[in-house]
Amino acid sequence: MKHLLGLLFFAFTAHAADRAPNIIFIMADDLGYTDVATFGSRYYETPNIDQLAAEGMKLTSHHHCQNCQPTRAALMSGQYAARTGVYTVGGIDRFDWSMRPLRPADNVTELPLDKTTIAQTLKKAGYATGMFGKWHLGEKGDHHPAKRGFDEAIVSMGKHFDFSTNPKTEYPKGEYLADFLTGKAVDFIQRHKDEPFFLYLPHFGVHSPFQAKAELMAKFKDKAPVGGHKDPEYAAMIASVDESVGRVMATLDELKLANNT
C-alpha cells in the first residue's frame, strides 16, 4: 500500500503542470444493488445515476465489504478492511453472543491513525480536499476527517430531518440532509474550481430511518409496484440521492469542469 500511495503521489506531482484531474466520490448508504434503474429497477427512478452509468463504467463483478463501516475503512485506506481491524459496524459488545453460534474477532470502531488516507495522499499532491456526510470512522479528536487529510469536513448521520452536524453548522429549519450535504459539496466545487480538488460526498441516505421529502413521495404514491420495489418513501429517498448526483453534475458542466473530473 505504501508503494501504491507513493506512486499516486508521484503521478499527480509529475503531471501538475497539466492540471491534475478533479476527483469526486459519491457514496449512497445501504443502497441495494438493484435499487437504481441502470441495474434493473423499474420502480425507483434514478436518471442522473443512469446517465453517469451510460457515459462511464459500470462495475458488474467486484469485491465489496459486508456492510457500511468496513466499506469506508477500505475506501479511505486503500486496503482490505480486514487489514484495518474494522470488520463490521460497531464493537462486538453490541450483540448478545450467548444467542449466536460464532463470535467474530474483536472489532475497532475507528480507522487506526497509522493508516494513511486517500485524502492525506491527495492533499500532499496539491489537491484541495473536502468531505461532507457520513464518515463513520471516528469523529473525536484526531479521528475526525478534518484531521485525516480533509481541508474541510462536515460529518452528519442519524436522521434526515433535524439532523446534527460535527462541527455544528446552521441550516434552514426543515432542510433535508441530502440537500444540505449537496449544497456544501457544490459550494466546495465552486470555491476550488481553479485548482485540483478531491470531493468525498458520502450520503447518509438511503439508510434508515426512512424519512423523505413529501413532494418526492407524492411522485411514487400511485406508481404500481414492481416485484419487491414498492415503497414510495424509500423511492423518494433514492430520488433525493439521485437529485444530488444531478446537482453535482450540473455544477461541473456550468463551470466547464466535467471533462477533467
Task: Please state what every model-predicted region is.
Residues 3-13:
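Sec-dependent N-terminal signal peptides
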